[in-house]
Amino acid sequence: MKMRGEKRRDKVNPKSSQRKLNWIPSFPTYDYFNQVTLQLLDGFMITLSTDGVIICVAENISSLLGHLPAEIVGKKLLSLLPDEEKDEVYQKIILKFPLLNSETHIEFCCHLKRGNVEHGDSSAYENVKFIVNVRDICNEFPVVFSGLFSSHLCADFAACVPQEDRLYLVGNVCILRTQLLQQLYTSKAVSDEAVLTQDSDEEPFVGELSSSQGQRGHTSMKAVYVEPAAAAAAAAISDDQIDIAEVEQYGPQENVHMFVDSDSTYCSSTVFLDTMPESPALSLQDFRGEPEVNPLYRADPVDLEFSVDQVDSVDQEGPMDQQDPENPVAPLDQAGLMDPVDPEDSVDLGAAGASAQPLQPSSPVAYDIISQELELMKKLKEQLEERTWLLHDAIQNQQNALELMMDHLQKQPNTLRHVVIPDLQSSEAVPKKQQKQHAGQVKRPLPHPKDVKCFCGLSLSNSLKNTGELQEPCVAFNQQQLVQQEQHLKEQQRQLREQLQQLREQRKVQKQKKMQEKKKLQEQKMQEKKKLQEQRRQKKKKLQERKKWQGQMLQKEPEEEQQKQQLQEQPLKHNVIVGNERVQICLQNPRDVSVPLCNHPVRFLQAQPIVPVQRAAEQQPSGFYQDENCGQQEDESQSFYPEAYQGPPVNQLPLIDTSNSEAISSSSIPQFPITSDSTISTLETPQDYIRLWQELSDSLGPVVQVNTWSCDEQGTLHGQPTYHQVQVSEVGVEGPPDPQAFQGPAAYQPDQMRSAEQTRLMPAEQRDSNKPC
């Protein structure tokens, strides 16, 4: 026991074992006491900062987790934890100021990473529990932090270090192990060093064992070695299935060795002769198990009454057997019945009893057995008589059943007939033999009662054999039917499996088709969506274009209105050519009179202006010619003159804009304002034109021809002042014009003639003087 204590002490603190050989329960320091106690509990001491940095750790961490203290100091605790537990542990460690009393004690469980994992293996973790308290380095300096700092630094820390840096988490880390024994006995060294020990009251029992402290774990373990023979016996007892079992019973009685065959359970009881059943209801199999006569039967005295009764019963059975030819007894079988009987059986009863006494010593057990067997024999006599009749009835019933089976088999195919036909021949031969046997039995003398008993027993056995032979073809036929049914069932199962496979394949094909249809529908939907989006985009573009066009139109409308107003307000300037001189005439364009600008010339008289003449839609006569100004130009000015008054042609200048030229005024051409007078009637017929020409023929002066631009051309001037060029033909032409002189070209219709109200230049006085009487 002392050696085991030394081994444990070596594991706990190797340094102390070198100094002291005897273990003394004394602790030099508080840290040492904590280290020893924690090592017994599979734990170690740790010191953490408020940030989770490991400040100090005990040396026994290397034996528990495989980390060296120098390597682990300075690391953060969160680096040794799995990723799933980092947030939870950080919330536990962090301190919130001001601290409450309940927050100074912290407990939590987590998993720490092991350090002695082999290269290439995955990281292993140990389930540990932290039990730490918040400590102030200044208040508990000599007790807790004596190994970290010197004593003279206590005052300096209290003065200069803030409160957050003075607080540390000091406590213990215990490893929670659940399967320690399994780890101990996996190694060979541990299994070889198993020692039978017994725990004493002096040493406490440690419940939790560490895998690293192997010998300390053996103090509480007991290795028990069992002999192979005892183990085999125990295994035999625990096993429920035993093929052969040898059972012996010790005592004054006889030793009986039995071999019991069993599939599931075995019987371990001894069989005694006095345990025979006493009830008369015995089955047929009990008698078939005794082919020979027991010698005890020969010792009983012969009863004359029994023999006489037995003879009478045999005489009665004789005629019954003759009527029933199916009694399965042959003369050879009868001769065989008497063969096993020795001549010694006919010895007197006294000699038989004397010979039985040395074999069976005088004891109460032997007498009881003999008396019980005698009673059984009496009861067997009665049962044999009854069962002979029952057997005859059973044989008849079986024959009827066989006939039905034959009828049924004849309907079946011929392949099955060879199984039944030999049995029929044997069954037909049996009744003939039975008839001969019964006839011989009646003629013979009455046999001995013992022979009668043997005869009855063998007749029963032979009848049972015959019934068994008759049942064999039925069993064979039933077996064939069962085989056929099994084959049919197998075929049905195979067909069902094939159908299931086909259904599965069809389902797979249907699923694939459905998936393809779904994909097609999705593609169609996507295409329709794209088309709708394109249509919407086009509609949006069209709407935007319409809006832009409307905006432009709205912007152009006020500009056009302004241009029209400017054109109406500006005075009309005309360039008039009189002879070879050009005269610019400025005509005021009042707002109340609309003067349209057309591509048709307007004639002015030198003395008096005339009303504009509308052209008739008739063909030009041959007596007149058409004078064209600039025949190849786009805007052609047309004038009609009579041939009589036609003078030499005048070279007319092209119609150009002379807005930059200086204004020239002439007194020979009076300027008349344009006034609107509704009293002037329009000339609708050629006669009106002739009449007007005749009235004005006396005062006919030089004709003034005015060329104007069209309305479209005026719109392109963009606000420039409009001028009318007026050309005056030669003066001095006399003679009234022909009535057809005012006939316009055929291209102009009467409805297109313009009113003379637009270019009235005649003053009111001249108009009154020229009116016809």
Swiss-Prot record:
GO terms for cellular component: CLOCK-BMAL transcription complex; Cry-Per complex; nuclear speck; nucleus. GO terms for biological process: circadian regulation of gene expression; negative regulation of circadian rhythm; negative regulation of DNA-templated transcription; regulation of transcription by RNA polymerase II. The keyword Nucleus applies. Signal peptide: none annotated. It comes from the Eukaryota. Residues 365-412, 475-553 form a coiled coil. Interacts with the CLOCK-BMAL1 heterodimer; this interaction inhibits CLOCK-BMAL1 transcriptional activation and suppress circadian timekeeping. Interacts with BMAL1. C-termini of isoform 1 and isoform 2 are sufficient to interact with and to repress the activity of CLOCK-BMAL1. This is Circadian clock protein PASD1. It comes from Homo sapiens.
